[in-house]
Amino acid sequence: MKSSSFTAPGKALLCGEYAVLRGAPAVCVALNCRAQVTVSKRTERVSIVSTVGFAEGSWRFKIIDGSVAWLDRPPEGVKSLLDAVCNNAPLTSCRPAALTIDTLTFFSPIDKKKLGLGSSSATTVALVAALQKQSFDIESIWANAKMVHKALQDGRGSGVDIATSCFGGLITYKSCDTAPPTKTTWPTGLYYQFFYSGTEADTTKAIDRAAGVSKKS
């Protein structure tokens, strides 16, 4: 059966990670780990989403009047993501489909923990690209993915990771920007290396701590 695959890269914030929340610029680079979403039509009357990497498994659902009606009980991360995409991005079709979301490259091969390289944003962008109603247009994908991201984050976060996953490369970004981010050239002779600490971080809690510090200052 014919299928289509869509991928989006992870990211690493080089500077401005929390200052960007207050309107300062951030510099972010796309990485070669990618989230992949594969879509294929189903002859059955229900859709199914399968995940590889995060919360591995398969769960059935239907799209009714633009909303997800779950027939199984997926993990909250899977449920909230698909719900947010269906509620905030115009869907290309409500016909039954099989979705496979693969984020395996965002997890440590040693202890299976998340590496903190933007898997959630990369998955959001790839899923929006796979399901949105418009033709494959990067700016419409960005606009819809930002809406999904805001819904998932309760309006918090800068959106720099969404922008990086959409446009790739090395970018300079401000959270107040409505135009696409500025592409930046990597300096000649400058090299970088990332190291995995072995400890996961909660992005939402980190944003809340940063907000608390800025209020005190």
Regions found by a protein language model. Name each.
Residues 1-15, 19-20, 28-29, 34-93, ...:
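C-terminal nucleotide
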Residues 115-137:
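DPxDG-like acidic metal-binding loop motif
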